[in-house]
A protein has these predicted regions:
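Catalytic cysteine-centered active loop of the rhodanese-like fold, especially the PTP/DSP P-loop
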Residues: 93-104, 108
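Metal-dependent polysaccharide deacetylase catalytic core of the NodB/CE4 family, i.e.
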Residues: 1-80, 84-97
Length: 131
């Protein structure tokens, strides 16, 4: 979503559509490519109405099963804390949420993915789950 609102409080389809359209336009402008049609409710907050609105707009909704407090740019976890939480909580079938605003995530990502591979995990794309 564009503003990352608590979408569970949005019941007006026009407001919901604008959130989705605005982020798609920004993505297109920034990357020069079309954004994939996936919806992740911010903060994991949603209503049945939201899920239906997303579906009506052609989005597939996904939730995460592994996340940690990485979104606060003013209170980033240490490398050790992040690595420990992420390796300790990984599980088969995990959908991992890592915010791109996290400096720590960027710094540990290569090491983290390597560790998960050493633990026997493989990685896939959301589109594989939709099919």
């Amino acid at each position: 979503t564009y503003h990352h609102y608590d979408m569970s409080k949005i019941s007006d389809p026009a407001v919901f559509r604008k959130e989705m359209d605005d982020v798609r336009a920004l993505f297109q402008e920034t990357t020069g490519t079309e954004m994939a049609m996936y919806y992740r409710p911010p903060q994991g907050k949603y209503s049945e109405t939201n899920l239906q609105m997303a579906k009506d707009l052609g989005y597939s909704t996904f939730f995460w099963s592994l996340a940690y407090v990485d979104w606060n740019v003013d209170a980033q976890p240490s490398h050790e804390e992040a690595f420990s939480k992420l390796t300790g909580r990984i599980h088969p079938g995990a959908v991992v949420l890592l915010h791109n605003t996290s400096k720590t995530n960027g710094e540990i990502l290569d090491e983290l993915l390597t560790k998960w591979e050493e633990m026997g995990y493989t990685f896939g794309k959301l589109e594989e789950l939709v099919q």
